[in-house]
């Protein structure tokens, strides 16, 4: 059942993930102006001739994003028609299309007109939302093929509210990380946990303040997820899905923290670390969104 839709969902999910990674690559390599101030053309050409590396990175990002955008729209329409009996479908379909289009327009606007760092930091956040919505649509297709796997754990109002809060807060943490990248504040603090050898550095220096804000947001997210893990294991041990999700969330945030510290300690010398850092937080956010979907299916006690 839904064999074609499931295949499209998997391909589209991987495609959006690739676009997300390419976007991180563009940011980490400073290739945002690799095609000049022209869009959708690249230096006025449909296909750039003899392009330098930054042009290849930017152009390939645009090309893949365009193809994946069409897949997302197809996925949303197909899901709307075949999975309309599932309450989450229409919301996820609308969000997936809106986010993929909006992030494309935001990227195009940044190339042609330029944008502030505050606005550009939203670009990665929209990518994360797009990825999460497509993955959840795909999950719905798999669930509908096997009704026995349509999980709807019964949880308390407090737990439900906490899961929603952590998911929303994780998006805030994503934004602070993206803002660090767009303000070139990655290395504003050398060393960890100290900042330039100080416990209390000058937070009024913009780059240092931005870096410390992200560190604080990341530490708080780790603590929130630790509470979620303990709460889930102690109270909802019978719900294997929630326990697995909470456990994976802890593993992802540990990897996220480790990769972030490694970026600082290696002076951002390894491109792979920065991309891995972006990948892990996107997977974590998607996992938390899945938990939100699960805990909101039943009316909480």
Swiss-Prot record:
GO terms for biological process: heme A biosynthetic process. It is an enzyme of class 1 (oxidoreductase). Residues 29-56, 114-117, 181-215, 262-274 are extracellular. Heme o binds at residues 61, 123. It is a multi-pass membrane protein. Pathway: Porphyrin-containing compound metabolism; heme A biosynthesis; heme A from heme O: step 1/1. Keywords: Cell membrane, Disulfide bond, Heme biosynthesis, Iron, Membrane, Metal-binding, Oxidoreductase, Transmembrane, Transmembrane helix. One of its GO terms (molecular function) is oxidoreductase activity, acting on NAD(P)H, heme protein as acceptor. Its EC number is 1.17.99.9. It is found in: Cell membrane. Its main location: membrane. HAMAP family: HemeA_synth_type1 (MF_01664). Catalyzes the conversion of heme O to heme A by two successive hydroxylations of the methyl group at C8. The first hydroxylation forms heme I, the second hydroxylation results in an unstable dihydroxymethyl group, which spontaneously dehydrates, resulting in the formyl group of heme A. Interacts with CtaB. Belongs to the COX15/CtaA family. Type 1 subfamily. This is Heme A synthase.
